Amino acid sequence: LKIAVLTSGGIAPGVNAALRAAAQEAFSRGWEVLAVEEGYYGLLEGEIRPVDRAELWGYVQLGGTVLGTGRSSEFEEKEEGKEWAIELLRDAGAEGLVVIGGGGSLSGGLALDELGLPTVGVPATIDNDILGTELSIGVDTALNTVAEVIDRIKDTATSHRRAMVVEVL
């Protein structure tokens, strides 16, 4: 079996760890893994390549997504774009797809699944707005970062005897 992995949309902390975990699970089952570079945009450009275990080793500590991310209006708005994406994945030998991303990314994965390509969605968004999930990848880090920044601003506000307003998202 050969699966492809794609990261798309806005990035969230932990996306690379999710990518590595998906690939490691596939390898443990004896499957091959393909990486789709630059999200749905890269998928429609045919940017699909094999991944080996050694490549994944350093991914966990890196921010962002090592595969890149990109949106595609052709994919989002046209049925032909989705059909072309499936054709490219199948030409590369992929029998399934793992999509790591937020709501729009997972909607794209659902569309591919409905067109016959088995697809798994991994929710990764700091917005934590994916229906049916309690926490998505990235939200804990985002909230802890906000709390840390607010603690620092509080010290500054106290020193200047001022109130501060912090807007998040």
What name fits each language-model region?
Residues 2-10, 66-70, 95-99, 163-167:
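Short glycine-rich or small-residue beta-strand-to-loop segments that form or flank ligand, phosphate
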Residues 147-169:
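Polyanion-binding loop/helix "lid" in catalytic or ligand-binding cores
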